[in-house]
Curated annotation (Swiss-Prot):
Protein family: Belongs to the saccharopine dehydrogenase family. Enoyl reductase subfamily.
Domain of life, source organism: Bacteria
Protein name per the record: Trans-acting enoyl reductase
GO cellular component, one term: plasma membrane
Length: 418
């Protein structure tokens, strides 16, 4: 049976967790007539979640599946056209579902922010997924759709204008309201550092800027590409004169997703494409101090974590960190916002700015982004790329998302500056 003829168009796996419930709420508010099912380990908890989602979700079927029982994942994959998964940490729980979807030719989207999970998915299942026609799309939340879509938008705009390929390209997180992390986010960062610190090869790979590329030997030598740096805004773009920027904690992951997008599309952005991410720390007299402090703290914390985290007792950490399935309150999420600006200079000297902004917090936005990724994969198949295998959001469905996301309150734009 082809994936388009299957019982469900979308299965949301992990529907009872924090991110899963938010994604379910978003899908239930979108009157799409899509055939949607909720999946997880407990039918009782699934039923309780469904009861809270409103009338459009009242007849959504429930599917029992468990990451520790691969046969249940395989059966779920054969029934679905698309599976959205919020079950993490993905390094610990994710590969069996990737395997099931690659085998069944089922499209897949997740919320991973874990480099080694991405690398293992590519190494183990890219070829099989390409052969069966599956799109295994990584990082479909705040990690890394704003980063990936902004660059894709710039690429499309420069190509339309005939102004050459992208060269120096920098994302600046201009505003961000998030104060609290969910239990799932904490578990994800912990698992990523535990993996890097317990395996010398993993440590080497997470420090390679082209960890996720299709062919490491084909990548150009663009010199050092540090993950963390403090920079004057004017060094990134004239429009940022007076500002200071510092390290962005998600930069090491997002940058590698964006570079994979370039490689998957046969380096369509260009072989001179050089990409970095920072966050704005304002333009006050204290901004340079804040830039140095934030950059040092993030670089030092992640650097030490990637080396030594595995030495920390896991149970002790679990007692003092948020539990998986928990997250910020609804009031906190509704007060949230973020704005990402990506500046590029093309090989002909043309300059552009892409903006990606959402007037909700990163968790509420992630639910929208994952939900719309699922709807794009299921319903917008004529807008998807021809690529198959282990993909990125931009490489799989960049044009579909650029068309779809503005319907949900996400602001996307690409403007020529010079």
């Amino acid at each position: 049976m082809s994936s388009a003829q299957r019982e469900f168009e979308i299965v949301l796996y992990g529907a009872t967790g924090f991110s899963g419930m938010l994604t379910g709420q978003h899908l239930a508010q979108r009157d799409t007539n899509a055939r949607i099912a909720l999946a997880g380990r407990s039918p009782q908890r699934l039923r309780a979640v469904r009861d809270k989602l409103g009338p459009l979700a009242s007849d959504w079927p429930l599917v029992v599946a468990d990451a520790s029982q691969p046969a249940t994942l395989e059966e779920m994959a054969t029934r679905a056209q698309v599976i959205l998964t919020t079950v993490g940490p993905y390094t610990r729980y994710g590969l069996p579902l990737v395997a099931a979807c690659a085998k069944a030719g089922t499209d897949y989207a997740d919320l991973t922010g874990e480099l080694m999970f991405c690398r293992n998915s590519i190494d183990l299942y890219h070829k099989q997924a390409a052969d069966t026609g599956a799109r295994i799309v990584l990082a479909c939340g705040f990690d890394s759709i704003p980063s990936d879509l902004n660059v894709h938008h710039l690429y499309r705009r420069a190509a339309e204008d005939g102004t050459g390929e992208l060269a120096e390209t920098n994302l600046v997180l201009r505003s961000f309201s998030q104060r609290w992390a969910s239990g799932g986010s904490v578990a994800t960062y912990s698992e990523a550092m535990r993996t890097a610190s317990s395996d010398p090869e993993a440590y080497r790979l997470v420090n390679d800027p082209y960890t996720l590329t299709t062919d490491r030997s084909a990548e150009p030598d663009l010199g050092p590409q540090p993950d963390f740096s403090m920079r004057r805004g004017r060094d990134l773009a004239p429009e940022l004169a007076g500002f200071w920027t510092g390290a962005f904690v998600q930069g090491p992951f997002n940058t590698r997703i964006v570079r994979r997008s370039n490689a998957l599309q046969d380096w369509a952005y260009g072989k001179q494409f050089r990409y970095s991410e920072t966050m704005s720390l304002g333009r006050s007299f204290a901004a340079p101090i804040a830039s140095a402090a934030v950059t040092g703290a993030i670089a030092g914390g992640i650097g030490l974590g990637n080396k030594y985290f595995s030495r920390l007792p896991q149970r002790a950490l679990e007692r003092v960190t948020p539990k998986p399935g928990t997250g910020p309150s609804q009031k906190s999420r509704e007060r949230g916002h973020y704005r990402c600006e990506t500046y590029t200079t093309t090989t002909t000297g043309a300059r552009y700015l892409a903006t990606f902004a959402h007037n909700v917090d990163a968790y509420a936005s992630t639910a929208v982004l994952l939900g719309e990724s699922g709807l794009a994969l299921a319903l917008d198949r004529d807008r998807l790329s021809e690529l198959r295998g282990v993909l990125t959001p931009a490489a799989a469905m960049g044009d579909a998302l650029l068309a779809r996301l503005p319907q949900t309150g996400v602001v996307v734009s690409a403007t020529r500056l010079h």
